[in-house]
Protein backbone atom coordinates (compact mmCIF):
# COMPACT_ATOMS: atom_id res chain seq x y z
CA UNK A 1 0.00 0.00 0.00
CA UNK A 2 1.49 3.32 -1.09
CA UNK A 3 -0.92 5.47 0.87
CA UNK A 4 -4.47 6.39 1.74
CA UNK A 5 -7.13 8.78 0.47
CA UNK A 6 -8.98 10.09 3.51
CA UNK A 7 -12.67 10.44 2.65
CA UNK A 8 -14.50 13.50 4.03
CA UNK A 9 -11.31 14.53 5.79
CA UNK A 10 -12.96 17.67 7.14
CA UNK A 11 -15.67 15.74 9.01
CA UNK A 12 -13.91 13.91 11.85
CA UNK A 13 -14.68 16.28 14.72
CA UNK A 14 -17.94 17.84 15.98
CA UNK A 15 -18.34 21.11 17.84
CA UNK A 16 -18.25 20.84 21.66
CA UNK A 17 -21.65 20.06 23.13
CA UNK A 18 -22.94 18.67 19.83
CA UNK A 19 -25.18 21.68 19.13
CA UNK A 20 -28.36 21.27 17.11
CA UNK A 21 -28.59 22.64 13.59
CA UNK A 22 -31.67 24.85 13.47
CA UNK A 23 -32.41 24.49 9.77
CA UNK A 24 -30.86 21.63 7.84
CA UNK A 25 -31.36 20.94 4.15
CA UNK A 26 -29.13 18.98 1.80
CA UNK A 27 -27.63 22.30 0.70
CA UNK A 28 -26.83 23.60 4.19
CA UNK A 29 -25.76 20.19 5.47
CA UNK A 30 -22.82 20.21 3.06
CA UNK A 31 -21.79 23.83 3.68
CA UNK A 32 -18.30 23.56 5.13
CA UNK A 33 -18.22 27.09 6.53
CA UNK A 34 -21.33 27.03 8.69
CA UNK A 35 -22.01 23.55 10.04
CA UNK A 36 -20.75 22.44 13.48
CA UNK A 37 -19.49 19.13 12.12
CA UNK A 38 -17.25 20.36 9.27
CA UNK A 39 -13.67 21.63 9.28
CA UNK A 40 -13.27 21.87 13.06
CA UNK A 41 -9.79 22.73 14.30
CA UNK A 42 -9.60 19.56 16.38
CA UNK A 43 -9.49 17.39 13.27
CA UNK A 44 -5.84 18.27 12.74
CA UNK A 45 -4.65 16.49 15.87
CA UNK A 46 -6.10 13.27 14.47
CA UNK A 47 -4.09 13.68 11.30
CA UNK A 48 -0.92 14.46 13.21
CA UNK A 49 -1.31 11.11 14.97
CA UNK A 50 -2.01 9.33 11.71
CA UNK A 51 0.99 11.00 10.06
CA UNK A 52 3.28 9.69 12.78
CA UNK A 53 1.99 6.17 12.09
CA UNK A 54 2.51 6.56 8.33
CA UNK A 55 6.01 7.90 8.85
CA UNK A 56 6.87 4.88 10.98
CA UNK A 57 6.23 2.70 7.91
CA UNK A 58 8.12 4.98 5.52
CA UNK A 59 11.72 5.13 4.37
CA UNK A 60 13.59 7.75 2.36
CA UNK A 61 13.01 5.66 -0.76
CA UNK A 62 9.49 4.48 -0.01
CA UNK A 63 7.09 7.00 1.54
CA UNK A 64 3.58 6.13 2.68
CA UNK A 65 1.36 9.10 1.90
CA UNK A 66 -2.01 10.50 2.92
CA UNK A 67 -4.29 12.56 0.62
CA UNK A 68 -7.17 14.62 2.01
CA UNK A 69 -10.59 14.79 0.40
CA UNK A 70 -11.64 17.97 2.19
CA UNK A 71 -14.31 20.29 0.79
CA UNK A 72 -13.44 23.47 2.67
CA UNK A 73 -13.62 27.19 1.98
CA UNK A 74 -11.98 29.63 1.69
CA UNK A 75 -8.98 28.18 -0.09
CA UNK A 76 -6.65 29.14 2.77
CA UNK A 77 -8.35 26.51 4.93
CA UNK A 78 -7.15 23.63 2.77
CA UNK A 79 -3.52 24.54 3.49
CA UNK A 80 -4.11 23.59 7.13
CA UNK A 81 -4.57 19.97 6.05
CA UNK A 82 -1.20 19.78 4.27
CA UNK A 83 1.09 21.24 6.91
CA UNK A 84 4.36 19.30 7.26
CA UNK A 85 3.03 17.00 10.00
CA UNK A 86 -0.38 16.23 8.44
CA UNK A 87 -1.46 15.12 4.95
CA UNK A 88 1.05 15.01 2.13
CA UNK A 89 -1.49 16.40 -0.36
CA UNK A 90 -5.12 17.51 -0.59
CA UNK A 91 -7.43 17.58 -3.58
CA UNK A 92 -7.78 21.10 -4.97
CA UNK A 93 -11.57 21.38 -5.14
CA UNK A 94 -11.37 25.16 -5.45
CA UNK A 95 -9.83 24.57 -8.89
CA UNK A 96 -12.44 21.94 -9.76
CA UNK A 97 -15.24 24.32 -8.73
CA UNK A 98 -13.99 27.19 -10.90
CA UNK A 99 -16.20 28.15 -13.83
CA UNK A 100 -14.92 28.47 -17.41
CA UNK A 101 -13.77 32.06 -16.94
CA UNK A 102 -10.27 33.41 -17.50
CA UNK A 103 -10.16 35.80 -14.55
CA UNK A 104 -11.51 33.15 -12.17
CA UNK A 105 -8.99 30.58 -13.39
CA UNK A 106 -6.05 32.99 -13.09
CA UNK A 107 -7.09 33.79 -9.54
CA UNK A 108 -7.56 30.20 -8.38
CA UNK A 109 -4.24 29.10 -9.90
CA UNK A 110 -2.38 31.98 -8.24
CA UNK A 111 -4.13 31.45 -4.91
CA UNK A 112 -3.52 27.70 -5.01
CA UNK A 113 0.22 28.24 -5.28
CA UNK A 114 0.16 30.95 -2.62
CA UNK A 115 -1.57 28.92 0.08
CA UNK A 116 0.32 25.68 -0.57
CA UNK A 117 3.71 27.35 -0.88
CA UNK A 118 3.10 28.94 2.54
CA UNK A 119 3.15 25.48 4.16
CA UNK A 120 5.72 24.00 1.76
CA UNK A 121 3.18 21.56 0.29
CA UNK A 122 2.76 20.57 -3.36
CA UNK A 123 -0.19 22.15 -5.14
CA UNK A 124 -2.65 19.70 -6.67
CA UNK A 125 -5.07 19.90 -9.59
CA UNK A 126 -8.27 18.01 -10.35
CA UNK A 127 -11.17 18.51 -12.77
CA UNK A 128 -13.48 15.56 -12.14
CA UNK A 129 -14.22 12.87 -9.59
CA UNK A 130 -16.94 10.42 -8.56
CA UNK A 131 -19.01 13.11 -6.82
CA UNK A 132 -19.31 15.81 -9.50
CA UNK A 133 -20.60 16.36 -13.02
CA UNK A 134 -17.93 15.29 -15.51
CA UNK A 135 -16.10 18.32 -16.82
CA UNK A 136 -16.84 17.45 -20.46
CA UNK A 137 -20.45 18.33 -19.59
CA UNK A 138 -20.03 20.76 -16.69
CA UNK A 139 -17.91 23.28 -18.57
CA UNK A 140 -20.56 23.68 -21.28
CA UNK A 141 -23.60 24.14 -19.03
CA UNK A 142 -25.52 27.38 -19.38
CA UNK A 143 -24.55 29.91 -16.65
CA UNK A 144 -27.89 29.54 -14.88
CA UNK A 145 -27.41 25.76 -14.73
CA UNK A 146 -23.68 25.69 -14.06
CA UNK A 147 -23.13 23.53 -11.03
CA UNK A 148 -20.62 21.03 -9.74
CA UNK A 149 -23.11 18.47 -8.45
CA UNK A 150 -26.27 17.43 -10.29
CA UNK A 151 -29.28 18.42 -8.22
CA UNK A 152 -32.00 18.30 -10.85
CA UNK A 153 -32.49 17.96 -14.59
CA UNK A 154 -30.34 20.22 -16.74
CA UNK A 155 -30.49 21.02 -20.43
CA UNK A 156 -28.18 18.77 -22.43
CA UNK A 157 -25.29 21.08 -23.38
CA UNK A 158 -23.53 21.13 -26.71
CA UNK A 159 -21.24 18.09 -26.55
CA UNK A 160 -18.77 19.53 -29.03
CA UNK A 161 -18.36 22.67 -26.92
CA UNK A 162 -18.14 20.60 -23.74
CA UNK A 163 -15.47 18.27 -25.09
CA UNK A 164 -13.46 21.16 -26.55
CA UNK A 165 -13.45 22.97 -23.22
CA UNK A 166 -12.68 19.77 -21.33
CA UNK A 167 -9.65 19.10 -23.53
CA UNK A 168 -8.53 22.72 -23.10
CA UNK A 169 -8.98 22.56 -19.31
CA UNK A 170 -7.04 19.30 -19.12
CA UNK A 171 -4.22 20.69 -21.26
CA UNK A 172 -4.06 23.69 -18.93
CA UNK A 173 -4.09 21.49 -15.82
CA UNK A 174 -1.42 19.06 -17.04
CA UNK A 175 0.90 21.96 -17.83
CA UNK A 176 0.84 23.22 -14.25
CA UNK A 177 3.57 22.31 -11.75
CA UNK A 178 2.29 20.15 -8.92
CA UNK A 179 0.37 16.89 -8.76
CA UNK A 180 -2.49 16.22 -11.19
CA UNK A 181 -5.29 13.79 -10.37
CA UNK A 182 -7.32 12.10 -13.12
CA UNK A 183 -10.74 10.46 -12.77
CA UNK A 184 -11.42 7.28 -14.74
CA UNK A 185 -13.14 7.98 -18.03
CA UNK A 186 -12.08 11.59 -18.40
CA UNK A 187 -9.23 10.42 -20.62
CA UNK A 188 -11.93 9.24 -23.05
CA UNK A 189 -13.80 12.55 -22.95
CA UNK A 190 -16.84 10.89 -21.40
CA UNK A 191 -19.81 13.21 -20.83
CA UNK A 192 -22.10 13.11 -17.82
CA UNK A 193 -24.96 10.67 -18.49
CA UNK A 194 -28.00 12.84 -17.80
CA UNK A 195 -30.86 10.53 -18.78
CA UNK A 196 -30.46 7.43 -16.61
CA UNK A 197 -33.95 5.95 -16.00
CA UNK A 198 -35.14 6.24 -12.41
CA UNK A 199 -35.39 2.47 -12.05
CA UNK A 200 -31.72 2.07 -13.01
CA UNK A 201 -30.28 4.61 -10.57
CA UNK A 202 -28.05 3.51 -7.69
CA UNK A 203 -26.99 6.63 -5.77
CA UNK A 204 -28.60 6.88 -2.30
CA UNK A 205 -28.88 10.64 -2.86
CA UNK A 206 -31.56 10.00 -5.49
CA UNK A 207 -33.59 7.68 -3.28
CA UNK A 208 -33.23 9.90 -0.21
CA UNK A 209 -34.57 12.96 -2.02
CA UNK A 210 -36.97 11.41 -4.54
CA UNK A 211 -40.49 12.61 -3.86
CA UNK A 212 -39.36 15.54 -1.70
CA UNK A 213 -39.68 19.22 -2.58
CA UNK A 214 -35.96 19.25 -3.56
CA UNK A 215 -35.28 16.02 -5.48
CA UNK A 216 -31.72 15.34 -6.61
CA UNK A 217 -30.61 13.08 -9.44
CA UNK A 218 -27.39 12.27 -7.62
CA UNK A 219 -24.00 11.17 -8.88
CA UNK A 220 -24.79 8.17 -11.06
CA UNK A 221 -24.17 10.14 -14.26
CA UNK A 222 -20.42 10.34 -13.61
CA UNK A 223 -20.20 6.74 -12.37
CA UNK A 224 -21.35 4.92 -15.50
CA UNK A 225 -18.69 2.30 -16.35
CA UNK A 226 -16.15 3.30 -18.98
CA UNK A 227 -16.45 1.68 -22.44
CA UNK A 228 -13.50 -0.54 -23.29
CA UNK A 229 -14.85 -1.98 -26.53
CA UNK A 230 -17.29 -0.33 -28.93
CA UNK A 231 -18.86 -3.72 -29.62
CA UNK A 232 -19.51 -4.36 -25.93
CA UNK A 233 -21.18 -1.09 -24.91
CA UNK A 234 -24.29 -1.84 -22.80
CA UNK A 235 -22.49 -4.78 -21.20
CA UNK A 236 -19.95 -5.03 -18.40
CA UNK A 237 -17.20 -5.59 -20.94
CA UNK A 238 -17.78 -9.30 -21.46
CA UNK A 239 -20.51 -8.95 -24.09
CA UNK A 240 -23.09 -10.56 -21.81
CA UNK A 241 -23.47 -9.02 -18.35
CA UNK A 242 -25.39 -5.72 -18.04
CA UNK A 243 -23.31 -2.98 -16.38
CA UNK A 244 -24.39 -1.74 -12.97
CA UNK A 245 -25.39 1.57 -14.63
CA UNK A 246 -26.55 1.69 -18.27
CA UNK A 247 -24.12 2.98 -20.88
CA UNK A 248 -25.56 5.28 -23.56
CA UNK A 249 -25.07 4.55 -27.25
CA UNK A 250 -22.67 7.51 -27.60
CA UNK A 251 -20.16 5.60 -25.46
CA UNK A 252 -19.45 3.31 -28.44
CA UNK A 253 -17.71 6.13 -30.30
CA UNK A 254 -15.72 6.96 -27.14
CA UNK A 255 -14.58 3.41 -26.38
CA UNK A 256 -10.92 2.72 -25.72
CA UNK A 257 -10.54 0.53 -28.81
CA UNK A 258 -12.01 3.27 -31.03
CA UNK A 259 -9.68 5.96 -29.69
CA UNK A 260 -6.43 4.02 -29.41
CA UNK A 261 -4.13 4.95 -32.27
CA UNK A 262 -6.22 7.93 -33.40
CA UNK A 263 -3.89 10.90 -32.97
CA UNK A 264 -6.85 13.31 -32.78
CA UNK A 265 -8.68 11.39 -30.02
CA UNK A 266 -8.99 12.53 -26.42
CA UNK A 267 -7.30 9.35 -25.19
CA UNK A 268 -4.22 9.97 -27.31
CA UNK A 269 -4.22 13.63 -26.23
CA UNK A 270 -3.99 12.53 -22.59
CA UNK A 271 -1.24 10.05 -23.40
CA UNK A 272 0.82 12.62 -25.30
CA UNK A 273 0.35 15.32 -22.65
CA UNK A 274 1.35 12.98 -19.82
CA UNK A 275 4.40 11.82 -21.75
CA UNK A 276 5.51 15.38 -22.50
CA UNK A 277 4.74 16.48 -18.93
CA UNK A 278 7.21 13.86 -17.70
CA UNK A 279 9.84 14.64 -20.33
CA UNK A 280 9.77 18.38 -19.59
CA UNK A 281 9.68 17.94 -15.82
CA UNK A 282 6.64 20.22 -15.55
CA UNK A 283 5.36 18.63 -12.35
CA UNK A 284 8.56 19.68 -10.56
CA UNK A 285 8.74 23.14 -12.11
CA UNK A 286 7.75 26.50 -10.70
CA UNK A 287 4.93 28.66 -12.03
CA UNK A 288 4.17 32.34 -12.42
CA UNK A 289 0.81 33.74 -13.52
CA UNK A 290 1.59 37.09 -15.17
CA UNK A 291 -0.80 40.03 -15.17
CA UNK A 292 -2.90 40.18 -18.32
CA UNK A 293 -1.50 43.62 -19.07
CA UNK A 294 -4.07 44.65 -21.67
CA UNK A 295 -7.79 44.22 -22.25
CA UNK A 296 -6.91 42.13 -25.29
CA UNK A 297 -5.50 39.47 -22.97
CA UNK A 298 -8.34 39.55 -20.44
CA UNK A 299 -9.74 36.26 -21.73
CA UNK A 300 -6.35 34.53 -21.75
CA UNK A 301 -4.98 32.33 -18.97
CA UNK A 302 -1.19 32.34 -19.22
CA UNK A 303 1.20 30.51 -16.90
CA UNK A 304 4.98 30.72 -17.23
CA UNK A 305 6.63 27.47 -16.11
CA UNK A 306 10.30 27.28 -15.23
CA UNK A 307 11.95 23.85 -15.29
CA UNK A 308 15.48 22.59 -14.83
CA UNK A 309 15.95 22.08 -18.59
CA UNK A 310 13.94 25.00 -19.93
CA UNK A 311 15.01 27.94 -17.80
CA UNK A 312 13.07 30.93 -16.59
CA UNK A 313 9.58 30.82 -18.13
CA UNK A 314 10.84 28.34 -20.70
CA UNK A 315 7.42 26.76 -21.15
CA UNK A 316 4.40 29.03 -21.53
CA UNK A 317 0.93 27.55 -21.00
CA UNK A 318 -1.82 29.59 -22.70
CA UNK A 319 -5.57 28.94 -22.62
CA UNK A 320 -7.81 31.04 -24.87
CA UNK A 321 -11.25 31.57 -23.32
CA UNK A 322 -12.10 34.59 -25.45
CA UNK A 323 -14.17 35.11 -28.59
CA UNK A 324 -11.25 35.53 -31.02
CA UNK A 325 -8.16 33.57 -31.97
CA UNK A 326 -4.97 34.45 -30.09
CA UNK A 327 -1.73 34.84 -32.09
CA UNK A 328 1.25 32.76 -30.99
CA UNK A 329 4.21 35.07 -30.21
CA UNK A 330 6.90 35.08 -32.89
CA UNK A 331 9.53 33.81 -30.45
CA UNK A 332 7.48 30.77 -29.40
CA UNK A 333 6.59 27.42 -30.95
CA UNK A 334 3.64 25.14 -30.19
CA UNK A 335 4.74 21.86 -28.61
CA UNK A 336 1.30 20.67 -27.47
CA UNK A 337 -2.29 21.74 -28.08
CA UNK A 338 -5.72 20.62 -26.99
CA UNK A 339 -6.83 20.67 -30.64
CA UNK A 340 -5.01 19.19 -33.64
CA UNK A 341 -3.34 21.42 -36.21
CA UNK A 342 -2.62 24.47 -34.04
CA UNK A 343 0.56 26.29 -35.11
CA UNK A 344 0.45 30.10 -35.31
CA UNK A 345 -2.97 30.97 -33.88
CA UNK A 346 -4.75 29.58 -30.81
CA UNK A 347 -8.49 29.00 -31.43
CA UNK A 348 -11.26 29.77 -28.95
CA UNK A 349 -11.56 27.22 -26.12
CA UNK A 350 -8.09 25.84 -26.83
CA UNK A 351 -4.93 25.53 -24.72
CA UNK A 352 -1.36 25.32 -26.01
CA UNK A 353 2.06 24.69 -24.53
CA UNK A 354 4.67 27.00 -26.03
CA UNK A 355 8.44 26.57 -25.92
CA UNK A 356 10.99 29.15 -26.98
CA UNK A 357 11.66 29.06 -30.69
CA UNK A 358 14.52 26.71 -31.41
CA UNK A 359 14.09 24.66 -28.21
CA UNK A 360 14.73 20.96 -28.71
CA UNK A 361 11.34 19.62 -27.69
CA UNK A 362 9.55 16.79 -29.47
Model-derived features with residue positions:
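Active-site and adjacent substrate-binding regions of carbohydrate-active enzymes
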Residues: 1-332, 337-362
Amino acid sequence: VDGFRVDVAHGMIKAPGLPDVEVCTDDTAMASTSMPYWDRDGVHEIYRRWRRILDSYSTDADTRIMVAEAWVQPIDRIARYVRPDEHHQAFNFSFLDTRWDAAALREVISESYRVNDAVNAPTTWVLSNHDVIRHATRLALAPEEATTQLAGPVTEPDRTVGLGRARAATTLMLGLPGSAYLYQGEELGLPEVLDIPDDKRQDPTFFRTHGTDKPELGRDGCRVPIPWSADEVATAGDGRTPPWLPQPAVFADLAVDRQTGDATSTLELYRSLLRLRRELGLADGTARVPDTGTDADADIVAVEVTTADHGDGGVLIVANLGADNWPVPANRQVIAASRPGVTTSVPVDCTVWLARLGSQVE
